[in-house]
C-alpha cells in the first residue's frame, strides 16, 4: 500500500517478489513453512484463518532460535546478521540481533508476535481468535502434520513430535525457545 503511488517503489517491490520467487524455486523451505501450512486453516472454525505470510513472519524468529542449536545453521544466521550490519561480538549475540530485527520488522508491519494475539485480518489483538483451549486441543495433530509436511525434510534441525509441539506452543504464547 505504501508503494501504490510510487512508481519506483512499485518497481522495487516487483523486483523483490521476482527475486524471492527465484530463490524459493532454487532452495528448499524448512519448518517455518511447515508450521505455517498446518496452522493456516486449522482454526477456521474459530472465526478465521492465519494468513500464510503472517504465520511465516510470526514463526521465523522462533524457528531461527530453534535451528541455531545446529552449528551450521547458527553460522549462517550469524553471517546474515553480519551482512545486515546488526552488530554483535559473538555468534549468539548476532543471532539474537537478527531475531530482534525480525521482531521489530513484524512490529513495523503490524504483524502479531504470536498466535494468541492474532486477531481479525491478521492484526495484533489483546485476545486473538484462537482460544487457548482450541489451540491445545489441536496441538498434537498440527505438530504431527507439520512434521510430515514436505518442507520439514530440508530444515537444518529435524524436530521430534515433542519439539514441534513445544515450538508451536512458543509460537502461541510468544515464549522463549530454549530447547
Model feature map: region roles:
Residues 13-21, 35, 60, 102, ...:
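Short alpha-helical scaffolding segments that buttress acidic/His motifs in well-ordered protein cores
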Residues 133-179:
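Short, amphipathic C-terminal "tail helix"
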Residues 1-27, 124-126, 162:
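Carboxylate- and glycine-rich phosphate/diphosphate-binding segment that chelates Mg2+/Mn2+
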Residues 42-134, 177:
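Gly/Pro-rich interdomain helix-loop hinge
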Residues 10, 92-95, 136, 161:
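Short, structured helix-loop boundary elements
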Residues 9-12, 31, 35, 55-59, ...:
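Residue-level detector of well-ordered alpha-helical segments, enriched
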Residues 18-56, 149-154:
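Glycine-rich phosphate/pyrophosphate-binding beta-alpha loops
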